Structures are given as structure tokens and as C-alpha cells.
């Protein structure tokens, strides 16, 4: 796994997970740890297999204690539409398009014993939007907000 950190009994894992099976396995394995709740924050890339989006939403909804959908690499697609396809008619998934704000909020809501699984981008150092690559590092952003927690 790319990155794992524990601070004041709150845990965070950042993993490169882009398929329904990988997301499910990560959540299920995380729940085996000594954690109170597993929160998953994830997104689906644009211009990729659209059929897996609703599957990933259903998996997060079913296996995580809390799930938030955010933007990954929307590429040339409308990020709001990607999130909509992930969520569908599921009621227990929240949506925050801005990935940095989504990470900040997820960390701020962690309680003692909780684990936050940030899935999707993993080791990537950029976010691809409309043909441009913007600097973005899940690890650095998450560490920044975890330090403040």
C-alpha cells in the first residue's frame, strides 16, 4: 500500500484503487483492522469504463461505514456527471467535488479509532482536467490536514 499513517488513534490509508473489486477488497480488509468505522473517499476517472462507476458506488455504500464521492481525474468529462453516475439513487453517499475539500472534511470528521481510506489516485502527483495536469498529491494534502487534527 502506498501510504498509511496513524495519528492520535485516527488512521488514514491512501491506495491506488480503480476497480470495483480493488475498492471492495480495500474496504473489507480495512474493516478487519481494529477500527471503529471505515470511511472511504473515492472518485472515478473520466474517459474510462463508465460501467464500473455505479458498481463502485454500490460497493462503497454497502461495505463502508461512510462514503464520499469526489473528483479523481475527470479528464474531458464533466466531473459532476461522473459523480452522479457513481451515486445513482444511493442515499448514503455524500458528494464533494473538490478533492482537497473532500479530504479536509473527511479528516475533520474522523473520530478516535476511525480509519479513512482515500482510494483512487494513490501515488499520482497531478489531477487531469480538460487536457491539463494540475499538481495534486493526496498524501501531502491528507498529511497537512491530519497534522491539524
Please state what every model-predicted region is.
Residues 8-11, 16-149:
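ATP-dependent carboxylate-amine ligase
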Residues 1-3:
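Short, exposed "boundary/linker" segments that immediately precede the start
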Amino acid at each position: 500500500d502506498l501510504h498509511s499513517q496513524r495519528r492520535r488513534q485516527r488512521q488514514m490509508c491512501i491506495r491506488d484503487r480503480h476497480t470495483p473489486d480493488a475498492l471492495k477488497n480495500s474496504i473489507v480488509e480495512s474493516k478487519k483492522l481494529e477500527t471503529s468505522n471505515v470511511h472511504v473517499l473515492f472518485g472515478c476517472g473520466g474517459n474510462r469504463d463508465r460501467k464500473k462507476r455505479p458498481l463502485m458506488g454500490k460497493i462503497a455504500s454497502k461495505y463502508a461505514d461512510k462514503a464520499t464521492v469526489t473528483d479523481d481525474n475527470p479528464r474531458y468529462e464533466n466531473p459532476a456527471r461522473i459523480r452522479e453516475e457513481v451515486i445513482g439513487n444511493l442515499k448514503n453517499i455524500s458528494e464533494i467535488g473538490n478533492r482537497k475539500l473532500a479530504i479536509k472534511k473527511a479528516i475533520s470528521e474522523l473520530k478516535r479509532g476511525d480509519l479513512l481510506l482515500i482510494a483512487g489516485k494513490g501515488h499520482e502527483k497531478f489531477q487531469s482536467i480538460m487536457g491539463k495536469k494540475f499538481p495534486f498529491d493526496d498524501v501531502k494534502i491528507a498529511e497537512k490536514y491530519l497534522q491539524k487534527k
